[in-house]
């Protein structure tokens, strides 16, 4: 299996954002990358976790077991989301390289010993930088990574950690479903095999718990959003994790209208170099009267669902755009 090699350029969009001011060390990934990026083989525990069908997921979702908690961990200009349903846990991204220990400690504080699912949305450092710490420190059922590689040290560290764990990464397939306790997860993207921008390789996941739903978008931009809509996926969700830290390159008018969220969450850092969240995005949310919860103003955001209603550990933030 040949994987296209891309160069990591931070989290910035090719057309909208500044290049990162931090020069990242490069590492040539050996052929062992292909061995861990395998969509057909998984560890025994992963196979046990994924033996449920869509019908079984719907049946389970009708008899909820406890609450659902979503932790948008404050990792600055980066993403890391811990999702808990009953005794089951999933982690989406793990922040920058310097956030690894922070995320590990946060998970331990929440009583996490095993992670049923880990998703590295795409190879940018601000999403997978701390992922090697997670892989090294926790027992993991299944790891999802998109079918793309990078020459960066951050990506190389993740590949090495997976290999050293004796695991293989699974390539996500749009339309695939799996259960996290009583919650049902559906993969919506990526829908193409080749993009100019690494952001559009982002794994997009919709989670349903009772009558509540959540959409996690990574750094997916308008190209990926339009592909998701063209595929006819149901993107309606109560809560939307705004793509790409609130960049103008994500959250198109059409996509936002289809999702029609009651709440929005943005993971970003005050005074970041990119001016996130951009004014265009904040104006869209303000015009639709969608409350915005943002880590740069509120710190870690914890969302709780009982399957019928959603509550937050804090009040909403402002619609103020970032300053470049």
Explain the meaning of each model-derived region.
Residues 4-324:
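Non-globular, low-confidence helical/coil segments that flank catalytic cores
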């Amino acid at each position: 299996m040949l994987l296209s090699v891309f160069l990591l350029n931070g989290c910035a969009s090719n057309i909208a954002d500044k290049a990162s001011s931090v020069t990242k060390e490069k590492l040539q990934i050996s052929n062992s990358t292909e061995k861990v990026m395998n969509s057909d083989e998984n560890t025994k525990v992963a196979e046990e976790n994924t033996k449920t069908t869509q019908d079984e997921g719907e049946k389970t979702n009708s008899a909820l077991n406890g609450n659902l908690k979503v932790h948008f961990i404050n990792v600055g200009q980066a993403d890391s989301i811990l999702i808990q349903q009953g005794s089951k846990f999933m982690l989406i991204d793990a922040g920058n390289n310097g956030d690894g220990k922070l995320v590990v400690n946060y998970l331990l504080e929440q009583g996490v010993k095993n992670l049923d699912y880990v998703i590295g949305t795409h190879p940018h450092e601000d999403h997978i930088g701390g992922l090697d710490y997670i892989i090294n420190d926790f027992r993991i059922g299944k790891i999802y990574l998109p079918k793309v590689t990078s020459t960066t040290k951050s990506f190389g560290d993740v590949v090495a950690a997976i290999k050293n764990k004796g695991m293989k990464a699974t390539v996500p397939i749009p339309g695939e479903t799996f259960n996290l306790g009583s919650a049902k997860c559906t993969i919506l993207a990526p829908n193409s095999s080749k993009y100019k921008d690494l952001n559009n390789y982002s794994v997009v996941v919709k989670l349903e718990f009772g009558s509540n739903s959540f959409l996690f978008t990574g750094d997916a931009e308008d190209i990926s959003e339009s592909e998701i809509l063209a595929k006819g996926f149901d993107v309606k969700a109560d809560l939307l994790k705004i793509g790409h830290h609130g960049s103008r390159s994500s959250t198109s008018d059409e996509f936002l209208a289809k999702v029609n969220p009651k709440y929005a969450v943005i993971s970003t850092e005050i005074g970041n170099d990119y001016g996130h969240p951009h004014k265009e995005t904040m104006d869209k949310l303000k015009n639709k009267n969608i409350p915005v919860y943002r880590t740069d103003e509120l710190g870690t955001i914890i969302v709780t669902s009982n399957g019928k209603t959603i509550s937050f550990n804090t009040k909403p933030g402002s619609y103020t755009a970032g300053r470049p």
